[in-house]
């Protein structure tokens, strides 16, 4: 019995690695982490989206590739090996899985299709459910969210926020709302964005 990646998974992984080797050298990564390579980062993001990464886990019926977590793991390995400054886990793994399993049919049609078409991008704020921090907390009441979240993942370039309260109830917030304040958190990893 064979326990490795399939030919399709290897092919997808190799395409991602090849793209990153060509467009995301360590010199490019260094410029991006020093705040000088905004256009370079946009080119990397655009190129990876053109490879179909945004629709990897979105079901085919909503315009995605309908692949599985093993494909996502293979892509994640390539992104990690190349120190890619690319928001992947939150917007293109966690969000499609949460929306596929926890949203209404109307929400699936709207949000999953928009992810596959690269019209929206989700940041993830699940720390309240996973490991609440002092001074943080969110509540849902009357279709409104109130509170403060720490360590929101992948907020840079995001249009929406997928967040959870301490009980695991998940909500969606449009980041264009004027009542939202985003504070960038400084961490050791300069290739990822975290916020409050």
Predicted regions and their residues:
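C-terminal helix-coil-helix/basic helical segment that borders enzyme active sites and/or dimer interfaces
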Residues: 28-36
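Active-site-flanking structural segment that lines cofactor/substrate pockets
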Residues: 39-53
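Conserved "HGTGT" condensation-loop signature of ketosynthase/thiolase-family condensing enzymes
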Residues: 14
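Internal helix-loop-helix
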Residues: 49-109, 117, 154-158
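FAD-binding core of flavoproteins
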Residues: 113-196
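Intrinsic disorder at enzyme termini
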Residues: 1-8
């Amino acid at each position: 019995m064979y326990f490795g990646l399939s030919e399709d998974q290897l092919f997808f992984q190799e395409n991602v690695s090849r793209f990153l080797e060509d467009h995301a050298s360590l010199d490019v990564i260094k410029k991006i982490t020093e705040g000088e390579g905004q256009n370079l980062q946009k080119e990397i993001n655009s190129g990876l989206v053109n490879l179909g990464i945004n629709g990897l886990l979105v079901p085919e019926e909503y315009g995605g590739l309908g692949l599985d977590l093993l494909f996502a793991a293979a892509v994640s390995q390539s992104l990690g090996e190349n120190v890619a400054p690319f928001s992947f886990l939150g917007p293109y793994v966690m969000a499609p899985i949460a929306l596929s399993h926890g949203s209404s049919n109307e929400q699936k049609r709207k949000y999953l299709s928009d992810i596959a078409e690269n019209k929206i991008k989700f940041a993830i704020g699940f720390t309240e459910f996973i490991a609440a921090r002092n001074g943080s907390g969110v509540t849902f009441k009357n279709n409104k969210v109130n509170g403060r979240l720490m360590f929101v993942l992948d907020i840079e370039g995001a249009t929406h926020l997928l967040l959870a309260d301490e009980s695991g109830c998940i909500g969606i917030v449009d980041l264009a709302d004027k009542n939202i304040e985003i504070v960038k958190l400084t961490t050791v990893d300069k290739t990822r964005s975290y916020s409050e």
